[in-house]
A protein has these predicted regions:
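A short, N-terminal "cap"/entry segment at the start of jelly-roll beta-barrel domains
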Residues: 1-21, 34, 66-67, 103-110
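Short histidine-centered beta-strand/loop micro-motifs
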Residues: 13-15, 33-39, 56, 63-64, ...
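Conserved short histidine dyad/triad with adjacent acidic residue
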Residues: 23-38, 76-77
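Short, conserved beta-strand element in jelly-roll/cupin
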Residues: 26-27, 39-54, 95-97
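Short beta-strand segments in beta-sandwich/barrel cores
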Residues: 32-34, 50-55, 70-71
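Short acidic-glycine-tyrosine-enriched beta hairpin
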Residues: 59-77
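Ligand-binding loop in jelly-roll beta-barrel domains
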Residues: 75-101
Length: 110
């Protein structure tokens, strides 16, 4: 799949059991995971290729990660988005737990 307006180039769930999940997400340079939060789970990020930018609110925080770097956890209920911070496709893992998965969309001004 080439660069597009789709939210993600690719999403694959590598492991999922009650209360825990590992996802692989691929973003082209113009794509991002939109603003959202999770009711119960925390996100930890690990970059496989490219660069990503994690933007969080309450308090405002910006984290950039490259290959082999990780960050987390993003606390439950803390609004965040993830974007490609480079000019090449970025691929990263998201480890999520402990609790039931949900994705609660937010507006940029929430």
């Amino acid at each position: 799949m080439g660069d597009s307006d789709e939210l993600y180039e690719r999403v694959a769930i590598h492991a999922e059991r009650p209360g825990f999940r590992i996802s692989e997400i691929r973003l082209t340079p113009t794509q991002q995971v939109p603003w959202h939060h999770h009711s119960n789970i925390q996100d930890t990020f690990y970059v496989l290729s490219g660069r990503i930018r994690i933007t969080l609110r309450f308090p405002d925080e910006h984290i950039e990660l490259g290959v082999g770097e990780n960050w987390g956890p993003a606390s439950a209920r803390r609004p965040h988005r993830v974007s490609n911070a480079g000019t090449d496709t970025a691929t990263f893992l998201v480890l999520q737990g402990m609790g039931d998965y949900d994705f609660v969309p937010e507006t940029a001004s929430s």
